[in-house]
Amino acid sequence: MTTLNEAMDSMMARFNPAKAKGVNAVVQLNATGEGGGQYFTAISEGKAMLTPGVSPNPTVTINVAAQDWIDIMGGKLDPTRAFMAGKLRITGDLGLMMRFQSMFS
């Protein structure tokens, strides 16, 4: 995958409803730099819906360079290492972010 849109489509294709059981949250993605954009994923009742734009009240916000997000979604960059290196900045419910990875794997 080479674009942010492709990365987001790939993420949504891997959504596992069983792992999202009991989750009611909104995850905001702010991808910066060339090819960047903003999306939010609403997760509720075992379903996930991706929407371009900004959520007025996200549970978690992810700030990341677009290429780093593409690399994370493509399996080229480990999200934990990206977080530890400061490439992936997360605000809000960190516990949810731990589950987020398993919901979309």
Residue ranges of each PLM-predicted region?
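Feature captures hydrophobic
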Residues: 1-105
